[in-house]
């Protein structure tokens, strides 16, 4: 898949830069960039897949092993960025390290790294007219409109004919500026399903944040939650809410409510950034969330039981990798 290729290219680029620049490579920002990119590929692989090789043509490794490799590689990237005096790649690597620790369950370490990332920082996936944003092209009003927001969220979206609106906050019913949406009654490309469009990214060259400071504050909040410090969690989350004009919520007194508040805020802050599925996997909520569809009746097209919570590796990897047995029965596939 593309992340395996990205990892290989980053590793190969580091070798070539070192070979050509020799001693000067150690303080060149390009080394920091490619080392960060290699670690970022490890992070995305570990977040998305239940297994993947750690190196090109290597044997299968677990998602945990890929995330542990991300931790090590982000450490190297941070050192390289410091040597190059490049704050952008250093902060992106620190943020990536915080995310990797979070996914590994190292909550104190995750919070410690996240705290180093200042407000306003964002490291984005960059798109342009040649490399277009397919989230926009497939899901967005005015483009293909082949996909849209699930019907679970429709009651929280107001119809409009003149401008985009915001999905309403589940706690206060206030429009949440972190979740721009668009629905004017138009149906999608199947000529049947109402097209509820995301509108956070409205242009085909819109960039998507991969790591950002608000996400780091969410990591700090989750670390508080994991230790039962609901008041500390609430303070962080309400600060994020205040920044967009939303009413604060009271400190929860039980775990279920605290978890719900945390995940609501993660959904809003990371809206359309590709984090929700992994959150449901991490918290063991995939089954209950899908069972609750249609007022608790479930959805035959989106079953709650036997539903994969992570992807197995791409079909092409075991086909062409001599160190992986090309046998579907040996692939991991965690399910509800």
Each language-model region and where it sits:
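Conserved, well-structured interaction surfaces
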Residues: 1-48, 76-84, 204-211, 239
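Alpha-helical junction/boundary sensor with strong preference for TPR arrays
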Residues: 17, 21, 49, 74, ...
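Residue-level signature for tetratricopeptide repeat
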Residues: 41, 48, 98-100, 223
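Short coil/turn linking the two alpha-helices of tandem helical-hairpin repeats
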Residues: 44-54, 85, 103-106, 228-229
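Hydrophobic-face positions in mid-chain alpha helices that act as interaction patches
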Residues: 67, 105, 109-214, 259, ...
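Long, intrinsically disordered, low-complexity segments
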Residues: 162, 173, 177-179, 253-336
